[in-house]
Amino acid sequence: MFKGIRKRASNLSIYAVTSNLSATNAPSDQQPASNSPSSYESILSQVHDFEIALKAMDYLLDDRTQQGTELLHEQAQLGSSDGKPHAIFPLALGVMEFIEATLGFEPEVMARAHKTLNDAESASTTNAKYNVRHQLATSNIYPPGTEFQVTLAESTLLNALLMLLTENNGMVESVKALYKLRKAYQTLDAVYKKIKELEPVFNRNLAKLRKAANKGLLEVPRLNGLVNGGTRLKHSISTVDLPGYESLGSSSSSSSATLPEDLKLMKNLEKIYLMRKARIEGTNLGNNTGVQHQPLNLFSDLASSIAMKQNGNGVETSLPIIPQYGKFNNGNEEQVEEQEEEGEGEEEEEENSDNEHFVDAVEELTIGDINSSSLADSSAQSILSSVETSPSEVQSTDMHLHVSTTDEFIHSGVQLCFGILQVVLSLIPPAIGKVLSIVGFKGERETGLKLLWKTAITSRNVHGELALLFLLMFYDGPVQFVDTGFRLPSANKLKNIINLENKTSVTDDEVELIKDSPESYTSQLLKRARHHFPHNALWILQEGRMLAAEGRLAQASTLMQNFTDNPNNKIQMQQIEALLIFDRATIYIYMHEYDKAARDLIYLIEINSWSKAVYLFMAAACYLERYRMVRMGLQSPQINADTKLSLNGDVELEAKKYSDLFTKYLNLSLSYVPGHGANAQKKGGLGGSGKQMPFDKFLLRKWKHIEQRKKRHPELSLADVVGTSLIHELIYFWNGYNRMSPQDFELALKLLGYSGAPNTELSANTLHNNYAKIEETEDEAMIRYFLQSVALRQLGKVKQGLGILDSHVISKYVISEVPQFRFHKMTYSPYLYPTAFYEKTMFVWLLRTSESTIKQDVGRAVHECKSYLKKAETVGEGDYELSNRTSMRIKAAGDRLDQLGSLSR
């Protein structure tokens, strides 16, 4: 699971109590932690809690949040009377509420999640101290309490992020959030170093387990006389979830008086094992249960993975290795078959009842009940039942099932949280990043991505799926966190793709290959997630985003539309429904299907309170663009010829309809902007707060320009006093110019020309045929030419696009570039001036590294491009609307160029 991670000495301090595992001088042949028999029940109870929590969070991933919440509350009530802490339940509930809160930003959901995560922090601290005080080792390699250090770090991290995302927080709350973030960072850093330090121990323990299970048959003297005397049992009872427990055959001197307790432990171990097995195979929620099964051989990848057994005739026959529990038999094959059939029913019963209390063996099985004639009917049949799995899962479950639930949680939890922290910190603009590094924060994007990829590939739990969601957002989300436009020509050549199916470990070298072509691997992982969680629209949303990122817009919109149109599909989480519909609306915009986009955007104000002003403004911009399309006689490329609008005498009527719709929804959008107009007190902004969002400020600036022109031209409608296309500016900031097809760009060029001055470059107007009713100002022309230059580049007309950008945009505010860079500080459209230099880096890169270039010099290209990025940073200094998005793009491009520069050396 952790192949390729460098070993690095470090210490992990878990409170002031000495643990049973020295972090600083662990010997190379270190044995698993040892627990006293009196602690076995407490340990297995905690492990059972973790499996319950993981199952509950899987319900969330399958859009069955209510079932997951009910499971947690039920288990919390059952455990409330035992006097033991159950820290994982508040964390699981907090994770579920955090995801719900950050999907929709509703203030009441965010407040509820904040309270739950506070409870999770307190419970984690209490449970960590409890395990240290009672020396409860639930891990084979980590000190007692480590798992609850991870739950503490996870709850602290999520709580800090939630506090930072709550915009109406004051300075005190923001400082508290940063303190929590620092606390989580330090804990995760310490545990991560410990994981790397103890990786050899982890691998040796796993190897010993596999070797021991493969040695052959094992005497079980404690059960002598129960079944035909001297039964020989395959050593397949794994005690990986109970460190230090001695197997049945390890103490021949033990009396039969301890048998009920042993059976109790075995029963509880079996329950945990079956829960983990079902989770890993994706059947724990009742999904994917119709697959044909065959007995599982956990060691099928080893040369000697088949155990040999002599039948009654002295002939050796091969038997599949049973993963944890052997089976009583006396060499009679018919009896074995009968027991296997009975075991199937028992296993199904166990998987459907994992929320029950653990078995009390003393109550269920007394000493007097034990005899050879009745044993076949006892609970031992279930304990020693065979385990089955689907053929496709045989390889994948080998390592997963022999890693304890606790170790799995520690590894995947640390990798997820520390990976996210590393990436998020690396995205912070340099000026802020330097300040944070002084107080202990340091983000390394490559390290973070490596951890997230490993978690997404190797972990079949909520951490693995959240890592996948983060990667999908990072690579394919509407906000550009990574700039994949800077590529070398050789990068487009077909490479061997690694098959991630059933992959339980991944090396650093493999991760590097994966990061070079992420789209080839996120698709594989997404397919697996959709298979495990078929009911959740979240995965439909992610697949739609992935298709859109690949330019397959029609497929993306059809996938999303068909899902919501199907009456059998019920989306339980309204936040996911809102995200899916918003993304579908943006895809319709990219395709110039503005009626469908406006329909979706207007519907959003009924189900989501994120920013009604932005939804309505975007809908208004869609109707404005339809108005222009009608007047120009244009239609979306997706509309068939026989369905196109008849342009005989209906043009003016149709145009007036869209003009009126634009006016209606523009005015309505203004009423939802916090602090503006007569309806200033209406709910609006992020999380319904009174603070204006960046796009609210963008909306108000655009309205100011429209209002000024309306005063100069009172005889014109609002639709006729708008300058450059509003929706195309919005398309750019929602990353649409990296998703549109050539046909969409061709239409975009024409529509952008609607507002152009007559007979100017790329204008749709002439002296004899003029659509625009107002004069194009230089500021509006700069916006138009900027967007048209990018469209030309995407159409392959790189030199023409760069010429437009230089002559009609950059030259308007740059005074000189050499020997000293000087420029006019313009304020009409603040985002435009740094963004133009950012886009110039892409033009220059394509020209300097194209295959037609006689000699490619990647180093020079990187140096030249970075010089333009430096100018973008200089021009973009200061706080302005959309400044975060602009600076994020610039930083993403700089990081990518640094990476390419290091490869060229």
From Swiss-Prot:
> So which domain of life are we looking at?
Eukaryota
Q: Which SUPFAM superfamilies match?
A: TPR-like
| Positions of the UniProt region annotated as Disordered | 325-356
Q: Mention any Pfam family matching this sequence.
A: Iml2-TPR_39
Task: Describe the protein's quaternary organization and the partners it interacts with.
Answer: Interacts with lipid droplet proteins.
Q: Does the keyword ATP-binding apply?
A: no
Q: Which InterPro entries match?
A: Iml2/TPR_39, TPR-like_helical_dom_sf
The Gene Ontology CC terms held by the record are: cytosol; mitochondrial outer membrane; nucleus
To which protein family does this belong? Answer: Belongs to the IML2 family.
Q: What is its main location?
A: cytoplasm
Bias category Acidic residues: which stretches? Answer: 334-353
Under which name does UniProt file this protein?
Inclusion body clearance protein IML2
